[in-house]
Curated annotation (Swiss-Prot):
Binds 2 heme b groups non-covalently. InterPro entries: Cyt_b/b6_C, Cyt_b/b6_C_sf, Cyt_b/b6_N, Cytb/b6-like_sf, Cytochrome_b, Cytochrome_b_C_euk/bac, Cytochrome_b_N_euk/bac, Di-haem_cyt_TM. It comes from Clethrionomys rutilus. It comes from the Eukaryota. Component of the ubiquinol-cytochrome c reductase complex (complex III or cytochrome b-c1 complex) that is part of the mitochondrial respiratory chain. The b-c1 complex mediates electron transfer from ubiquinol to cytochrome c. Contributes to the generation of a proton gradient across the mitochondrial membrane that is then used for ATP synthesis. This is Cytochrome b. The gene is MT-CYB. A ubiquinone binds at residue 201.
C-alpha cells in the first residue's frame, strides 16, 4: 500500500497534499476552515446537481418548479434547504477563513492570498445568481437592483446592463443565463481551489506564532485528518439543525411570493452574507462612487500585504493591533445589521460612519498600530 501511495502517478499527488504533507505541529482549530470550505463546495455541487434535474429556468415555471421540488420530489425539501442553508454555512466558513488569514498574517503568502480573493469574488457571484433562480419577489428585484448598478459605468454602462439582461429588463433571457452560469461556476471554483492549494503547498502553512515551523513539522495524516473530521461533524450538525428545525430563518419571506415586475417590495435587500457590502454601497450618495466602494470593500484585502508595517507576522503578540482587529469585526457586524435596515434616519448616518470606520481601520489605524508596536518593542 505504501509503495502505491508513494509511486502511483495519481495517488502520489493526493499523498503529497493530504497524507504525507508536512504541517506545523501547533496549528489550531482556526486552520480547520479550509477543509470545511471543501466540504461545503462538495455539498453545494451535489445538492445543486439534484436540484438542476428538476428545476426549469423559465420565468413562467421557475417558481412552480421549486415548489414542485419541495412538495413532490422525494426528499426534495431536504435537498433544496441543504443547498440554500449550505450557502450560508459556506459564507460563515469563508468569513472565518479570511478573518483567520487577516489575524495571523497569512496574507504575506501573496499568491495564495490573491487566489483566495479571486475565489471569494467567484463564490459571491455564484451565490448572487443562485438567489435569482427561485424567481420570487426578492430574486427578481435583487437581480434588477444589483445588475442595474453596472449602468453607473461611464459610456458603456447602459449597453452593458442590457447585454447582461438579454433585453430591456430582467426577464426570461436573464434567468436562463443566470442558471447556466450558476451551474458552471462551482466547477470553475473547484479548479481555482486546486490552484489555491498548489500555491499554499509551495510555501507551507502559516501557524499561530507566525514563526518559521520547518524545524517542527508533523504529517498531515493522521493528526490533522482526525482534527478536520471533528470540524466536519460540527459543521454537518449545525447545518442539519438549521435545515431540519429553522430552514427559512436566514431567507426572506418575500421570496415566497412569485416575481412581479409591477409590485416592488418595501425593502429590497440581498442575502445576509452580502449585507455588509450592501450597507457600504448604500452609504455613498453617488451611484458610481457606491459601486466602486462596494468592489473596493472586498478588493482592499489585496492591499493587506502592502499595508503590513509590523516586524511580526501575526497579531498573537500585538495587543494594540488586536484591539483594532476586533473593532473591525464589530464594525462588520454593525454594517451587516445596517444593510438589512430601511434607508432612513438614524440608519443612514450609522451606515456611513461604519463604512468610513471599515476603510480607516484597515488603511490607517492597523498600519499605525503596527509601527507603534515596533517602537514599543524597539524592533526598528
Amino acid at each position: 500500500m505504501t509503495i502505491i501511495r508513494k509511486k502511483h502517478p495519481l495517488i502520489k499527488i493526493i499523498n503529497h497534499a493530504f497524507i504525507d504533507l508536512p504541517a506545523p505541529s501547533n496549528i489550531s482549530s482556526w486552520w480547520n476552515f479550509g477543509s470545511l470550505l471543501g466540504l461545503c463546495l462538495i455539498i453545494q455541487i451535489l445538492t445543486g446537481l439534484f436540484l438542476a434535474m428538476h428545476y426549469t429556468s423559465d420565468t413562467s415555471t421557475a417558481f412552480s418548479s421549486v415548489t414542485h421540488i419541495c412538495r413532490d420530489v422525494n426528499y426534495g425539501w431536504l435537498i433544496r434547504y441543504m443547498h440554500a442553508n449550505g450557502a450560508s454555512m459556506f459564507f460563515i466558513c469563508l468569513f472565518l477563513h479570511v478573518g483567520r488569514g487577516m489575524y495571523y498574517g497569512s496574507y504575506n503568502m501573496i499568491e495564495t492570498w490573491n487566489m483566495g480573493i479571486i475565489l471569494l469574488f467567484a463564490v459571491m457571484a455564484t451565490a448572487f445568481m443562485g438567489y435569482v433562480l427561485p424567481w420570487g419577489q426578492m430574486s427578481f428585484w435583487g437581480a434588477t437592483v444589483i445588475t442595474n448598478l453596472l449602468s453607473a459605468i461611464p459610456y458603456i454602462g447602459t449597453t452593458l446592463v442590457e447585454w447582461i439582461w438579454g433585453g430591456f429588463s430582467v426577464d426570461k433571457a436573464t434567468l436562463t443565463r443566470f442558471f447556466a452560469f450558476h451551474f458552471i461556476l462551482p466547477f470553475i471554483i473547484t479548479a481555482l481551489v486546486f490552484v489555491h492549494l498548489l500555491f499554499l503547498h509551495e510555501t507551507g502553512s502559516n501557524n499561530p506564532t507566525g514563526l518559521n515551523s520547518d524545524a517542527d513539522k508533523i504529517p498531515f495524516h493522521p493528526y490533522y485528518t482526525i482534527k478536520d473530521f471533528l470540524g466536519v461533524l460540527i459543521l454537518l450538525t449545525g447545518l442539519m439543525i438549521l435545515v431540519l428545525f429553522f430552514p427559512d430563518v436566514l431567507g426572506d419571506p418575500d421570496n415566497y411570493t412569485p416575481a412581479n415586475p409591477l409590485n416592488t417590495p418595501a425593502h429590497i435587500k440581498p442575502e445576509w452574507y452580502f449585507l455588509f457590502a450592501y450597507a457600504i454601497l448604500r452609504s455613498i450618495p453617488n451611484k458610481l462612487g457606491g459601486v466602486l466602494t462596494l468592489i473596493l470593500s472586498i478588493l482592499i484585502l489585496a492591499l493587506l500585504p502592502l499595508l503590513h508595517t509590523s516586524k511580526q507576522r501575526g497579531l498573537t503578540f500585538r495587543p494594540i493591533t488586536q484591539t483594532m482587529y476586533w473593532i473591525l469585526v464589530a464594525d462588520l457586524l454593525i454594517l451587516t445589521w445596517i444593510g438589512g435596515q430601511p434607508v432612513e434616519y438614524p440608519f443612514i448616518i450609522i451606515g456611513q460612519m461604519a463604512s468610513i470606520a471599515y476603510f480607516a481601520i484597515i488603511v490607517i489605524f492597523m498600519p499605525m498600530a503596527g509601527m507603534i508596536e515596533n517602537n514599543i518593542l524597539d524592533l526598528d
